[in-house]
Amino acid sequence: MLKNLESPIIKIIDFGSACDERQTVYTYIQSRFYRSPEVLLGLPYSSAIDIWSLGCIVVELFLGLPLFPGSSEYNQVSRIVEMLGTPPNWMIEVGKQAGDFFEKRQDEFGRKTYHLKSMEQYSRERGTKEQPSKKYFQANTLPEIIKTYPMPRKNMKQSEIDRGKHPAWLRWARQS
């Protein structure tokens, strides 16, 4: 929660799904826009999912829009894959729900690879009507979004406009 529009102080709230890290009993956890790949794919999770959520929230506070505004779990996974690439094979092989989103193939050398199912294939298999959702950014990587997102808005201070080009944000985005 943003405590004051004039100050960058935030307050962490809503611990409704909080649990001891050794007793992860929930399967439906995290708000969709901030849901980690581990949770989406049905992997065992740890406090690392909180760092994912925090990163998504920090980016949203900076840009004013969510980074992964998925309209469904499939749409959420597809947005993450578009920006970050296909998860490692081990995550897909271990994830209980990964087969809902990915199909196994073989490359020309006989090695297994995984590919995100098309929206049509997913809809057909799941009996849903997935629809493309709004895309807020033309860029596909976080550094590109930070560089190209039109930050200036009405009544913005010059310091707020300059943050869009701040090198610390770009360094952080490249390391993430």
List each model region and its residues:
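Conserved catalytic-loop aspartate of Hanks-type protein kinases
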Residues: 50
